Amino acid sequence: MKPYPIDLVSVVIPVYNEEASLPELLRRTEAACLELGRAFEIVLVDDGSRDRSAELLQAAAERDGSAVVAVILNRNYGQHAAILAGFEQSRGDLVITLDADLQNPPEEIPRLVERAAQGYDVVGSIRAERQDSAWRRWPSRLVNLAVQRSTGVAMHDYGCMLRAYRRSIVEAMLACRERSTFIPILANGFARHTCEIRVAHAERAHGESKYSAMRLLNLMFDLVTCMTTTPLRLLSLVGGGMALAGFLFALFLLVLRLAFGAAWAGNGLFVLFAVLFMFSGVQLLGMGLLGEYLGRMYSDVRARPRFFIERVVRATPSALPSALQRAGFTSSSSEPSTP
């Protein structure tokens, strides 16, 4: 494994209704990046916020000496689509993702850059002393275990978005066109050398989690359908097992009917209904799982954009930080973009 030269670091942060936390987020992220001794840019993607987040991001990008790039999406597309939009606008040799809620402190960024410079393709993180509620921690552990077994990549905290990706990995992810994706899993599919570091985890200081029960359920289906077809194979095995169990149960009822007469068969009617309802439930569950796969295939076949960027606001060349100017990156202000 050879050292990886890093001249420019991009920090991509998806933002959704984070007006209260943005000033502190910008201040702490810029301070952490200044410690790197490298050129940097902070790409903040507004994912259709309903508060003043987009206005604050644009103002931050337009101020003198700003390293902020504001990417404004026309509506809410979800966290991972917003991150991909940020990837598309980033230019760094190393791209770091970070949540806007400050539960993972930006002060950990230099540690990620240090490990990536050693030659790792992907640097993940493990939340130490996680501050989320139990109903969020336990499903996360189950998902992490399932992902490890399915992908064969032993990373322990796929839910933590504080991660670093080499430029080649980012370009490979952008070349993938499926709509339902989970970035940490997708990245590990292209990475040869990966590692993890333990990072601090704080309670959410502003607002509340954007992941409702329905969003978590949708994320679970994204995980299942984007990483493996194993559930479909299991469904076939379950169907075969149920058919065999049904045949054996019917044979068992026939033997009892012959042994105990017609009166016993009448008493066993409710048992038969219970078994029938159980089989029907499993069938409907299987149909729902098939529907999830077919629905995602339909979305991919339509080939619609995963996101639409309404506008991109960058610092003018005269306002770029000196470190960024030395790296040779310049751009015009408020440039329109296409997905």
UniProtKB/Swiss-Prot annotation:
Catalytic activity line of the entry: UDP-4-deoxy-4-formamido-beta-L-arabinose + di-trans,octa-cis-undecaprenyl phosphate = 4-deoxy-4-formamido-alpha-L-arabinopyranosyl di-trans,octa-cis-undecaprenyl phosphate + UDP
Alphabetical keyword list: Antibiotic resistance, Cell inner membrane, Cell membrane, Glycosyltransferase, Lipid A biosynthesis, Lipid biosynthesis, Lipid metabolism, Lipopolysaccharide biosynthesis, Membrane, Transferase, Transmembrane, Transmembrane helix
GO cellular component terms given for this protein: plasma membrane
Membrane topology: Multi-pass membrane protein
Enzyme class label: transferase
Cell membrane found in the keyword field: yes
Protein name: Undecaprenyl-phosphate 4-deoxy-4-formamido-L-arabinose transferase
Transmembrane spans: 235-255, 269-289
GO molecular function: phosphotransferase activity, for other substituted phosphate groups; undecaprenyl-phosphate 4-deoxy-4-formamido-L-arabinose transferase activity
